UniProtKB/Swiss-Prot annotation:
This is Pantothenate synthetase. GO terms for cellular component: cytosol. Homodimer. It comes from Francisella tularensis subsp. mediasiatica (strain FSC147). GO terms for molecular function: ATP binding; pantoate-beta-alanine ligase activity. Belongs to the pantothenate synthetase family. Its main location: cytoplasm. GO terms for biological process: pantothenate biosynthetic process. The lineage of its organism: Bacteria, Pseudomonadati, Pseudomonadota, Gammaproteobacteria, Thiotrichales.
Length: 261
């Protein structure tokens, strides 16, 4: 596996790739888990070359503490990527991605950008879309692999690719879950054993509910010791975000299936 720690190194590697080769790209913020691994395996099965990026993007964090406590396990991540036979790891610095600071940003005007996560985390989607645009301009992949867990993010990236005429196909992969139903997330690494017990109780409640009375469901979730930030039905999906201690988790799933594995 080739590791590029800056854009100049990456461009040298990218330019050496045979143009006829199909390139798959999996953007991550590190702290890799089986959800990321499923994306990478999908990319490996459909492309000649797979690029994975690790960059914890500061502009998409509206809470400084969340940014500072985001899990960092670079050496372990490198071992995971090497074991998966990833071709290129792109691991840029903040200075690489924002050489002159955060002077230009994508500001989404879509309705989906201003509800749920957009309402709860002002500026999050702007920062996310800005860095994704930069990463796509750098990597120039044929295929981009995203997880369904970040459903709003996926919808906005689809619009980004369309509006900016980016010749990249987006492949959306199913959310990977623990047996309890809890979606895999890098932030799960910050959960204590007690927190995990609370999460398991929440997902037991969610699996048994028919989502006809969200106020009652809110009370049930809060009774576990968690703090529900929002739960909402949108089309045929349920969206929710909640805190367990200081750890914020999000999820979405089809109303008919619930959070099934």
């Amino acid at each position: 596996m080739i590791i590029a720690d800056n854009i100049k190194q990456f461009h040298s590697i990218r330019n050496s790739l045979i143009k006829q080769q199909k390139i798959g790209f999996v953007p991550t913020m590190g702290a890799l888990h089986n959800g990321h691994i499923s994306l990478i395996k999908k990319a490996k099965s459909e492309n000649d070359v797979v690029i994975v990026s690790i960059f914890v993007n500061p502009t998409q964090f509206n809470n400084p503490n969340d940014y500072q406590t985001y899990p960092n396990q670079l050496q372990q991540d490198i071992q995971i990527l090497a074991s998966l036979d990833v071709d290129v790891l792109f691991n840029p610095s903040e200075k690489d991605i924002y050489p002159d600071g955060n002077l230009l940003r994508i500001e989404p005007k879509l309705e989906i950008a201003n509800i749920l996560e957009g309402k709860s985390r002002p500026g999050h989607f702007s920062g996310m879309l800005t860095v994704i645009l930069k990463l796509l301009q750098i990597t120039k992949p044929n295929n981009l692999y995203l997880g369904e867990k970040d459903y709003q993010q996926v919808m906005l990236i689809k619009q980004l690719v369309k509006d900016f005429f980016i010749n990249t196909k987006i492949i959306v992969c199913p959310t990977q879950r623990q047996p309890s139903g809890l979606p895999l997330s890098s932030r799960n690494k910050n959960l204590t054993s007690t927190d995990i017990e609370i999460a398991n109780k929440i997902y037991e409640i969610l699996r048994q509910d028919n989502f006809s009375n969200l106020e009652e469901l809110t009370n049930k979730i809060n009774s576990t010791g968690a703090k529900l930030q929002y739960i909402q039905k949108l089309n045929n999906r349920i969206f929710l975000a909640f805190y367990i201690g200081k750890v914020r988790l999000i999820d979405n799933f089809l109303k008919e299936t619930g959070p099934s594995c």
